[in-house]
A protein has these predicted regions:
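Residue-level signal for alpha-helical context at structural boundaries
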Residues: 11, 67-75, 176, 189, ...
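Charged phosphate-binding loop/patch that engages nucleotide di/tri-phosphates or the phosphate backbone
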Residues: 239-271
Length: 271
């Protein structure tokens, strides 16, 4: 597997990702969730991340299209973008019309697959259904709680679950490659994490966007949003290089309006 951001520049604007239908992903969440409480928390988080991922991808595409001598988006990508818009409207309903704008960011070198960003956001945390210490069911007394020591396994468990259920490698990598700001083999070894010693780093722009979007929302109970600064402080616990990488990603993709999103999704904000 290629390592580093350099490989991301040659992404699936050329070869589009093989991804499932929106309805298939929605059915997967319902079939996988062990309880309504688990579904509401995990699927709800994925809806938020899918929304932010789409916003980032769409925003970056608008930045590229506004440049002088910008290339036209291909017909295939344009159709995927329209599909993504329709799916997002189904996900968030009337809130689509009042989604707050993203500020800043850089125009990408190539157009981004907005459908891949949206579907990747919906898929990325499917593995968290398999790291529940208490699953929120009646047998668990309605208590919902994650298994903290094994939570780091959710990406790999989600990846394997998707592959085992016939989903493509393209789809499964959204689950595998979204932890932190990119989890390297070295970090796995140094931190003695219970994972195979490999890189868990985004391999496409769309995977990187989902990884970034994921940092703005937490599946705490109750769930909450995090500002850029709140996640920077969290990233800094693993070293200043980690925090700097986060700020570079924010500069690259822009900053969502977290207060506005929190109001739409009725969640609190950690500033």
């Amino acid at each position: 597997m290629e390592n580093g951001a350099e490989s991301i520049l040659n992404c699936n604007s050329i070869k589009l990702a093989n991804l499932p239908d929106f309805s298939e992903v929605e059915k997967l969440h319902k079939a996988t969730a062990p309880s309504s409480a688990a579904y509401e928390l995990i699927h709800g988080h994925c809806v938020v991340i899918s929304t932010i991922s789409w916003q980032i991808a769409h925003h970056c595409n608008m930045l590229l299209s506004s440049e002088n001598h910008a290339p036209q988006m291909s017909d295939t990508l344009r159709k995927r973008a329209e599909l993504a818009k329709n799916c997002l409207q189904e996900l968030v309903g009337d809130s689509y019309a009042i989604l707050p704008a993203i500020s800043g960011g850089l125009a990408p070198k190539q157009y981004i697959d907005e459908y891949a960003a949206l579907i990747g956001g919906l898929l990325h945390d499917i593995g968290t259904y398999f790291v529940l210490e208490s699953d929120g069911s009646s047998n668990a007394g309605g208590i919902l709680r994650f298994d903290g020591p094994n939570y780091i396994l959710h990406g790999l468990r989600g990846y394997k679950y998707l592959i085992d259920n016939g989903f493509s490698e393209d789809a499964a990598q959204f689950a595998r490659n979204h932890t932190g700001v990119g989890l390297t083999r070295e970090q796995v070894v140094v931190q003695n994490l219970p994972l195979p010693a490999e890189d868990y780093i985004p391999q496409t722009v769309e995977q990187e966007i989902v990884m970034v979007a994921d940092k703005y929302n937490s599946k705490s109970i109750p769930p909450r949003f995090l500002t850029v600064d709140a996640y920077r402080r969290k990233a800094a616990r693993f070293g200043e290089d980690n925090a700097n990488k986060w700020m570079q990603l924010v500069a690259k993709y822009g900053e969502p309006d977290i207060a506005g999103l929190a109001e739409i999704f009725n969640m609190r904000v950690d500033a």
